[in-house]
């Protein structure tokens, strides 16, 4: 086994004494920093490499802090002006994951970079911390490499805003496995339409 495989196994046992101590100290450190800052290197190099990171020019890591918990509907004094069924203000759950929110914030802050992927690095009772991999698409090391040329195309601008990253696709119900096989047809709406439309074939 290579070194990264050993690191992967360490991260899989988050309740071990070593990892509990490390995560606790790191969370304290991250809380002292600003909510969005550039990290000099990935905290989890094994995970970052699995998600496409390379330790070369053109790749950037940003660490994002996101507040945990549900979403409160932003209405003045709870006045939603509607029917009682839609009066909910406090116990509203956001449709997307906090990881995709972190990606979006990084993408907004670094408008000239493209969001490749992200991963979890820690959490406490108030915050979750994610590291986002961003790519400088105008760097020659990226543009000249056939493996990374795909992200330089204009169609991938702000892919994190349109649910095209891994975290975004998961929130859209797209993926492989038993969690996602009900989303047939490309989207939840298409799957619903397909199931809910009565088809009366001529020869049946």
UniProtKB/Swiss-Prot annotation:
On whether Ribosomal protein is a keyword of this UniProt record, the answer is yes
Q: Which UniProt keywords apply?
A: Cytoplasm, Ribonucleoprotein, Ribosomal protein
Q: Which Pfam families match?
A: Ribosomal_L15e (PF00827)
Q: Which GO terms describe its biological process?
A: cytoplasmic translation
The main place the protein resides is cytoplasm
Localization, per the record, is: Cytoplasm
Cellular component annotations (GO), alphabetically ordered: cytosolic large ribosomal subunit
**Any one Gene Ontology molecular-function term assigned to this protein's record:** RNA binding
Q: Which SUPFAM superfamilies match?
A: Ribosomal proteins S24e, L23 and L15e
The protein's matches in NCBIfam families, at most eight in alphabetical order, are given as: PRK04243.1 (NF003269)
Task: Share what the entry says about its subunit structure, partners included.
Answer: Component of the large ribosomal subunit.
- Provide the family line: Belongs to the eukaryotic ribosomal protein eL15 family.
What exactly does this protein do? Answer: Component of the large ribosomal subunit. The ribosome is a large ribonucleoprotein complex responsible for the synthesis of proteins in the cell.
Q: What is this protein called?
A: Large ribosomal subunit protein eL15
Record the organism. Answer: Mylopharyngodon piceus (Black carp)
Upper classification of the source organism reads: Eukaryota, Metazoa, Chordata, Craniata, Vertebrata
Instruction: Give the gene name.
Output: rpl15
């Amino acid at each position: 086994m290579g070194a990264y495989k050993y690191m992967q196994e360490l991260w899989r046992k988050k309740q071990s004494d070593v990892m509990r101590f490390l995560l606790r100290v790191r969370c304290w450190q991250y809380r002292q920093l600003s909510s969005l800052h550039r990290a000099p290197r990935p905290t989890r190099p094994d995970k970052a490499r699995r998600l496409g990171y390379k330790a070369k020019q053109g790749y950037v890591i940003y660490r994002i802090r996101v507040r945990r918990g549900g979403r409160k509907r932003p209405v003045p004094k709870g006045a939603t002006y509607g029917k009682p069924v839609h009066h909910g203000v406090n116990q509203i759950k956001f449709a997307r994951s906090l990881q995709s929110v972190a990606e979006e914030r990084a993408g907004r802050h670094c408008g000239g970079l493209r969001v490749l992927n992200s991963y979890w690095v820690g959490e406490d009772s108030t915050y979750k911390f994610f590291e986002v991999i961003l790519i400088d698409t105008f760097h020659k090391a990226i543009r000249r490499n056939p493996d990374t040329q795909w992200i330089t195309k204009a169609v991938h601008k702000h892919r994190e805003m349109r649910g095209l990253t891994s975290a975004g696709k998961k929130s859209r119900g797209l993926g492989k496995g038993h969690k996602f096989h009900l989303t047939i047809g490309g989207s939840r709406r298409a799957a619903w339409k397909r199931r809910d439309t009565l088809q009366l074939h001529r020869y049946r």
